[in-house]
Structure formats: C-alpha cells, structure tokens
C-alpha cells in the first residue's frame, strides 16, 4: 500500500515479503506457485483423477474453492457458532467431474477441512502459505471480472453502469490482504466505502464502542488504499477529506461518487497480475519444472510461457462456442477483462470480441444443470506475443493527470491512442461544485477538460515475441484510431449476484 510509504512490488505483496531484490522476488513467487502445483497434484491423487480429469478447469476450480474454504478462519468460526441445517461446518467439498463410458458425470465430494489444510501445508513446506491462497482468490476474481458485469451492484450504490471498467476485483474476499488491495479498481474501493457509510447512516451504533473503533480503523485504511490509487493531488486531497470526516454520511458518498466518475478520465493505478488455475501449476510441477530455482513473475513473460505449453480442458454446454469459452478464460488468466480489445487481440493473435457477442456462459456449472449433453474441449490459451502487465492506468503526461482510457483499465504496458468521447463523460459533471470540496472538484474538472483524446498512452512501449524473454525488441502496434475497444459496452452479460 502506497500510503505506508513503502513501495513494494506486486510480487512482494503477493508473497508477503518486505523489500527484496528481483532475484529473491522471483524465487519467492516461484515457491508460491510450486506450492499450489504440489497441492494440486496431491489432491488429484487423493481423488483418483485421471490425467484428463485433472486438466479439467472445472475440477481445478472446485479444488481451489475447497482449500480457500478450509482456510477461511472467520467463516469457519461463524459456522461453528451458527450450525445450518444439513451442513457440516467442519467439511468442505464440491462437484468433481469424471469421464465415465464416454460421458461426463458429476460427483459431489466431501472432505474434512482439517485434511485439506494438512495437504496444503504439506505441499507448502509445512507453512500456511497465505500468499498462495491469495493468488487463488485473485484468479477467481479475475475470472469473475471477465464473466460477469456488475451493473446491479453499481446501481445499488448510486453509481453508474458506465463505470464498470473501475470494478476490477469487486468479488475478492475481504481477507485478500495487500496483494488483493493492489488489484482492486477505484470503483471497487468506492463501492466498499459507500456500503460502509450507508451502514453507518442506518445503524446508530456502527461507529460506536469498541467495535466502532475497529470499524473506524478499517474505514480509514480503505480510504488510504483508495487514496494511494489516485495519481493527482486534487483527487488525493479529496480522499483526505473523506477519511477525516467526523461521522461519514451523504456528503462523503457524493464525494466518493464524484471521485469514481473522475477516475474514468484521471485513471487510478490498479495492478494487474496473471494468476492461472491451480491445474496449470500442477501440470508444470508434474513435468519436473522447478519454479523456485527458475524463478517466476506474475507480470512478465512467465505466465505466457506457461500457457503456451499447457493443455487445459473445459466442459462445454450444448450451444456454447468453444472458441468463446477459450477467450473468456484467456482474459481471466491475464486479468484483461478491462483492457482495450484492440490491445488484447493483438497480443493474443486472434480477434477478442466484446462480452455481448460471446456465445458462452460462465465456466462453472450449476448443480442443477443436466450433464447428459455436456461435452469437453481444449481451451486455446496460447498467445502470439507477450507484454508486461502495468499498474499505471495509462495516463499520458508523466503518467499523472491526463486522459486515461475511458471504459478501459489498461492491463498491458503497450502504446495505444485514447479514443474517447469526452462530452459523454463531462456531462456527468454538471453543476455541483459547492461544499467543502469545491476547490478540489473545480481543479479535477479542469484537469479532465484539458485531457486530450488524441494523446498516446504508454508511449514507445510494445509487445514482445515469445522468444524474446529479456524484452529487448519491443514491437509497437498501430491501432485503428477511432475504434475504441471496450469489452463490456452495450452488453447484457449475466450479473455476478444472480
């Protein structure tokens, strides 16, 4: 978190380490993913999964969810105290899909959480390996970001569906730590804060007493995380106002919504990491790859390279398009749900289409879906090029205050122009500049008005051939100027909350 004055790289956040040099970071991230891989292999053995079944992404997700549930301390404590009908709080499980007589069958499995924790620790040299758990949470979050649109959640908190590109990480659990905070979008943080303020408005005791003190500390911490994402002094000053408010109410909600809107042009810095399904790490470990010795990075060539040589399968419903299912998972793997489609298409080497044109539903299969007609296909997760993941938000002048990309939160550090219709956005900023934050609001609006659509973000940055692991020869793509590529626009994707 920027606000504590230590700038750690995402990998350090990911592995819980303090300042390390590049080699140490690569080694500790390598240790983390190899632990995930070893755990996955062990679970496949326990469940007697065939090689093919072990490469099925739905099985991977079930196994990942089991270990996340086994380590969810707060929920486990809650479940112990509130026994629900027919659910054993000490057990966890889910659907495992097996191939029987040329058909896929669903089998519900149940395990002791204690047993799962033992297998996980054993795979991670006896440690709890929280970093590995967070890594799995981020993979699930990235998958949700690519699959669902959070328009309902946005509207409920008084925000606008057009802000969907600010919603990265909106389904991350609270316990995802610093690595989780780094990847949350501005809209996600604003939404969490608004929910908190609304509770305070409705519940007199929310800020009071011993509990209230803890609530207040959490509130200020979230404000600091959000402040650290903004890159202009005026936006940060407004966050100080929100944080220092005696008892936060509607004025603060107004300020937060204003800030969220402003982030459509004055982009926040949001980290992007390629987090892959556990089965991918399992395959690599099983084939004898030594992650710890070789080192690994979530923001460089390594995930691309891993996906080039991994064969992962997915169940496909009768009228789904396997190529579209592949695109969904590819986007999730590279945390590219909010990237410009022109950039994604160039890197992937095949056209990436908007969410509304995908003939595919989510990756997970509901328990009431009929397995009879289920088929399975290979997911095409390879790419033509690779590119470095960014956290800058794509603002142009000195990466500070200027036009970011509307409806896009850049994932890759690749040069692109910023086609956007400023009028549409500025229309949201009519009137209300009075109140305590008036001078900051005026300043923010001034910066937004001077943002030029013809600017170029990530000047001179390009993609790299997969053989160019040291990133020596950038290839700078040229894009069609007037064609902006937002994944979610004009879309009727399923809602996450359904």
UniProtKB/Swiss-Prot annotation:
GO terms for biological process: symbiont entry into host cell; viral penetration into host nucleus. Disulfide bonds: none annotated. Late in virus-infected cells, may be cleaved from a 56-kDa protein to a 53-kDa protein by a cellular caspase. This cleavage might be a marker for the onset of apoptosis in infected cells or have a specific function in virus host interaction. A motif (Unconventional nuclear localization signal) lies at residues 1-18. Keywords: Capsid protein, Helical capsid protein, Host nucleus, Host-virus interaction, Ribonucleoprotein, RNA-binding, Viral nucleoprotein, Viral penetration into host nucleus, Virion, Virus entry into host cell. One of its GO terms (cellular component) is ribonucleoprotein complex. GO terms for molecular function: RNA binding; structural molecule activity. A motif (Bipartite nuclear localization signal) lies at residues 198-216. Residues 1-21 are annotated as: Disordered. It is found in: Virion; Host nucleus. InterPro entries: Flu_NP. Encapsidates the negative strand viral RNA, protecting it from nucleases. The encapsidated genomic RNA is termed the ribonucleoprotein (RNP) and serves as template for transcription and replication. The RNP needs to be localized in the host nucleus to start an infectious cycle, but is too large to diffuse through the nuclear pore complex. NP comprises at least 2 nuclear localization signals that are responsible for the active RNP import into the nucleus through cellular importin alpha/beta pathway. Belongs to the influenza viruses nucleoprotein family. Homomultimerizes to form the nucleocapsid. May bind host exportin-1/XPO1. Binds to viral genomic RNA. Protein-RNA contacts are mediated by a combination of electrostatic interactions between positively charged residues and the phosphate backbone and planar interactions between aromatic side chains and bases. This is Nucleoprotein. The gene is NP.
């Amino acid at each position: 978190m920027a606000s504590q004055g230590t700038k750690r790289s995402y990998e350090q956040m990911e592995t819980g380490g303090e300042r390390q040099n590049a080699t140490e970071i690569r080694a500790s991230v390598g240790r983390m993913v190899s632990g995930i891989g070893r755990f996955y292999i062990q679970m496949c053995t326990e469940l007697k999964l065939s090689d093919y079944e072990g490469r099925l992404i739905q099985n991977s997700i079930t196994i990942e969810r089991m270990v996340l549930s086994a380590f969810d301390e707060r929920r486990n404590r809650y479940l112990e105290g509130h026994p629900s009908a027919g659910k054993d709080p000490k057990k966890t499980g889910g659907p495992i899909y097996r191939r029987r007589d040329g058909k896929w069958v669903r089998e519900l499995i149940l395990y002791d959480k204690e047993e799962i924790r033992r297998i996980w620790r054993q795979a991670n040299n006896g440690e709890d390996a929280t970093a590995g758990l967070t890594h799995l949470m981020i993979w699930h979050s990235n998958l949700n970001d690519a699959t669902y649109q959070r328009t309902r959640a946005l509207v409920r908190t008084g925000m606008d569906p057009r802000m969907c590109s600010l919603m990265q990480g909106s389904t991350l659990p609270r316990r995802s730590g610093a690595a989780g905070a780094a990847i949350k979008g501005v809209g996600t943080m604003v939404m969490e804060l608004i929910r908190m303020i609304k509770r305070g408005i409705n519940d007199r005791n929310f800020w009071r007493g011993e509990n209230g003190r803890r609530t207040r500390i959490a509130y200020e911490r979230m404000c600091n995380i959000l402040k650290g994402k903004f890159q202009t002094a005026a936006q940060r000053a407004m966050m100080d106002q929100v944080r220092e408010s005696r008892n936060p109410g509607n004025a603060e909600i107004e300020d937060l919504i204003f800030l969220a809107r402003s982030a459509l042009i004055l982009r926040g810095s949001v980290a992007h990491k390629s987090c892959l399904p556990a089965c991918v790490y399992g395959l690599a470990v099983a084939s004898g790859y030594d992650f710890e010795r070789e080192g690994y990075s979530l923001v460089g060539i390594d995930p691309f390279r891993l996906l080039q040589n991994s064969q992962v399968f997915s169940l496909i419903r009768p009228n789904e398009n396997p190529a579209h299912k592949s695109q969904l998972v590819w986007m999730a793997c590279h945390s590219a749900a909010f990237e410009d489609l022109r950039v994604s298409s160039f890197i992937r080497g095949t056209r990436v289409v908007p969410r509304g044109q995908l003939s595919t539903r989510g990756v997970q299969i509901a328990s009431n879906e009929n397995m009879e007609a289920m088929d399975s296909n290979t997911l095409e997760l390879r790419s033509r090029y690779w590119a470095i993941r960014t956290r800058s938000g794509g603002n142009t002048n000195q990466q500070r205050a200027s036009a970011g990309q509307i409806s896009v939160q850049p994932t890759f550090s690749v040069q692109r122009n910023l086609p956007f219709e400023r009028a549409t956005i500025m229309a949201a900023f009519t009137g209300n500049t009075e109140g305590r934050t008036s001078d900051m609001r005026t300043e923010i609006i001034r910066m937004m008005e001077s943002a030029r659509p013809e600017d170029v973000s990530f000047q001179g940055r390009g993609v790299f051939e997969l053989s160019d692991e040291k990133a020596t020869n950038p290839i700078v793509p040229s894009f069609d100027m007037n064609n902006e590529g937002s994944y979610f626009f004009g879309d009727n994707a399923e809602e996450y909350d359904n």
